[in-house]
Amino acid sequence: AEFVSQNIDKNCILVDMGSTTTDIIPIVDGKAASNKTDLERLMNNELLYVGSLRTPLSFLSNKIMFKDTITNVSSEYFAITGDISLVLDKITEMDYSCDTPDGKPADKRNSLIRISKVLCSDLNQISADESINIAIEYYKILIDLILENVKKVSEKYGLKNIVITGLGEEILKDALSELTKSNEFNIISIKERYGKDVSLATPSFSVSILLKNELNAKLNRS
């Protein structure tokens, strides 16, 4: 947050979507205004336990629309957000860096199979296109959840500039695209400004830049 306030915007929301969680950090007058404990952050829309890889699909919803029918889903650990992220081209196979639920490769074909299992099925019973549609249904739920929480933080602090970073940047762009339609909000991408490697390791990059700036300041004073 300190790096963002010093180098990008002193009044904004930093949204960092990693593999497991999404952090929503309000920055006001150059200072992080977020709550201190995870419990407080969960209670105030500043921490979401949804990420671009590890979140079980059954956590997002226990029902989805399938063939125009609201359909119950299995709560077993069959598929994760990494599967829908990969199938929908939000991440690459290389980005899918965690273990898969079934221990099989992190490729699109196996992701489609894992997604079909959420409906206690396989690609013999439902088609690949239908499995993609399941992924789309879950993706809509995922981005709606992110949007809902970011909007609440925005309304609480009156912040309209949003800085996005992390493995889930492409997901965040989709989630927050509705906000940019009004021209009131401005989305700033760390990946577009500093590159993908920085977006994937923003905390480490931020610390190195802050230390460099501090060292330069000391040298200038000496």
From Swiss-Prot:
Reaction catalysis annotation: gamma-L-glutamyltyramine + [5-(aminomethyl)furan-3-yl]methyl diphosphate = (4-{4-[2-(gamma-L-glutamylamino)ethyl]phenoxymethyl}furan-2-yl)methanamine + diphosphate
Listed GO MF terms: hydrolase activity; transferase activity
Pathway: Cofactor biosynthesis; methanofuran biosynthesis
Disulfide bond sites: none
Key word Transferase present: yes
Top EC category: transferase
Transferase in keyword set: yes
EC assignment: 2.5.1.131
Gene3D superfamilies: conserved archaeal protein q6m145
Keywords of this entry: Transferase
Record-linked Pfam families: Hydantoinase_A
Function: Catalyzes the condensation between 5-(aminomethyl)-3-furanmethanol diphosphate (F1-PP) and gamma-glutamyltyramine to produce APMF-Glu.
Family (UniProt): Belongs to the MfnF family.
UniProt name for this protein: (4-{4-[2-(gamma-L-glutamylamino)ethyl]phenoxymethyl}furan-2-yl)methanamine synthase
Species, as recorded: Methanococcus vannielii
Higher taxonomy: Archaea, Methanobacteriati, Methanobacteriota, Methanomada group, Methanococci
